[in-house]
Amino acid sequence: MKSSVSIATRTPARTATAFAPLGLTLVLALAGCSGDGTTFGDTNGAPTTGVYVIQNTAPPASGSVAKASATTTAATGTILQFSTSASGAATPVSTIANLNVTSLAYLAVDGTGDIYTTATEGTTGTSVLEFPVNSSNNAQPTRAIPFNTTTQISVPNGLAVDAAGDLALPEANSGIAIFASTANGSVAPTDYIAGGGASTLVNPTAAAVDTDDNLYIVNSGEDVTNPIVVFNTTSTGAPIRSIGGALTAMTVGSPQAIATDAAGNLYVANVVSGVSSILIFEPTATGNTPPLRDITGSNTLLGCVGGIALDNEGYLYVVSVPTCGSTASPTVLKFSTTGDGNIAPVATFTSATWTNADPTLSIAVY
């Protein structure tokens, strides 16, 4: 796998929905139509670059709104795209919507700007979906990998994509399913790193890949010593190194999301006892080594952080809510990748159309 940026998140304060297996039902349902049969002509008019987040809208509660409608409004999942220069109260520059799905989780982009997410259609199941760069409205996915016994995906804890479009999905309380960029439909993983044993994986909760084929995994659960383990393509199941210890400022369960830059530096969105920080480690970091930089403090405006992503212009983006467990609307905080200590973000934005992020506060940037 080759990549400079990968995103996958899970925040303990919010519980993600467990996804059921399915066949190809979802793929057919997404063939260019909204839930009410409406089609849109402009499905590839979005800007090439942007900041992507998820808005999951629940159906209206029983009451006047629901009773006023002749039809039942279903829950919907939408990908919102904002400008990388967004600030303040922002308006999306584009959306991927009308997908006939009830919820979305996790976001990632590959080297060409294609967008990846997992989508749930009611009770029929879930797939990993890829949308072309510039997708908008009810754009059709170019590929979909369903969750079933063949793909060995059931309840993923995240999603990482490298520059070529290879996928890595950490499975809850299990291992890592890896798919080649050509994988499509109900196919077996190209490779699978099994949990337990030599891999030391207990409950992998996030993933990222770098340009040197290193696969970073956040590992949690009982008997886990170091919260980050690193594999590469020559691994036979055992990690090549791990990162953890008092000097790292991480504890088991504290990393919420991870990402890498083109130089191979590792960025960790970290929460310890409700206090958030962004930790940056050098590419060769191993064992109980301190981070190169640690962005934390009141000036940062970090509340309880979730997803993290990087652009190619020297900025990192993190999603934050006021406190862990908060249902308040999320905020994107933008920092320089060279920032350190108690610094203010260079920009922040919220949006009136982004009020209910996915449980993992996912974000992707291209």
Model-identified regions with their sequence ranges:
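Flexible "stalk/tail and boundary" regions
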Residues: 35-366
